[in-house]
């Protein structure tokens, strides 16, 4: 009974977000023709290909975001972001309707807390990814640079909660946890040994042109008899930053 009452109380606290007074529709469409010439220096010879390509620089998307003021400096809101292939119209992110981000948040003088599907701290994705600016290419070009530079495993996760502190002296601290990172590809139970779980702490420092990022994250892989049973739990430490000189950024 206590669990039921607690769940009702949480839902009631966030119910106002469904009637957000300020809703924004946004999107990106990246579509063009792509020509490639490949010569592997084998008996097969060179190949040429001309095709329509979606998302060469930035993934096509559309989204909705809204905010409702509750008073006393507290507000609730949501972000719903869909990914799709612009050349076919097909849904992306394993056929999810809002696969790029689906979050409900509350923020105020205490900081910000959000729930749902979101980018992990050690990614450049969504509202809470911290490390996208560590690469000069960010998350563009299909995220290929992002994936090989500072990130291991999933870049967006289901069943996730994140807390962001207020900013003090340029510092902001983050904590994130996913009870089951990807529910579409495995028969799992949240917070149990047969689910892939994620823990992370992160911090940013911003002072004018100087931006610093640090994260520590851990993957607690499925320990059941599933496909992940041979994987050791992972631990990643990421440090980086940038400085904007005006004419160039390093």
Predicted feature locations:
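Outer-membrane beta-barrel proteins
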Residues: 1-250
């Amino acid at each position: 009974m206590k669990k039921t009452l607690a769940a009702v109380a949480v839902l009631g606290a966030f119910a106002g977000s469904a009637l957000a007074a300020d809703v924004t529709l946004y999107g990106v469409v990246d579509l063009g023709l792509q020509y490639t010439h490949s010569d592997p220096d084998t008996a097969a010879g060179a190949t040429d290909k001309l095709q329509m390509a979606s998302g060469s620089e930035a993934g096509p998307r559309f989204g909705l975001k809204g905010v409702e003021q509750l008073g006393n400096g507290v507000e609730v809101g949501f972000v719903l972001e869909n990914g799709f292939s612009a050349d076919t119209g097909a849904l992306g992110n394993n056929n999810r309707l809002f696969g790029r981000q689906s979050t409900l948040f509350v923020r105020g003088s205490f900081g910000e807390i959000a729930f749902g599907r979101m980018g992990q701290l050690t990614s450049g994705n969504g509202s809470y990814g911290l490390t996208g600016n560590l690469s000069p290419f960010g998350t563009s070009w299909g995220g290929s640079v992002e994936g090989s530079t500072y990130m291991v495993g999933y870049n967006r996760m289901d069943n996730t909660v994140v807390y962001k502190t207020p900013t003090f002296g340029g510092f902001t601290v983050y904590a994130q946890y996913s009870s089951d990172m990807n529910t579409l590809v495995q028969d799992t139970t949240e917070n149990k040994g047969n689910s892939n779980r994620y823990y992370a702490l992160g911090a940013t420092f911003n002072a004018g042109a100087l931006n610093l990022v640090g994260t520590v994250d851990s993957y607690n892989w499925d320990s059941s008899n599933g496909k992940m049973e041979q994987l050791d739990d992972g631990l990643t430490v990421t440090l980086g930053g940038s400085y904007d000189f005006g004419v160039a950024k390093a």
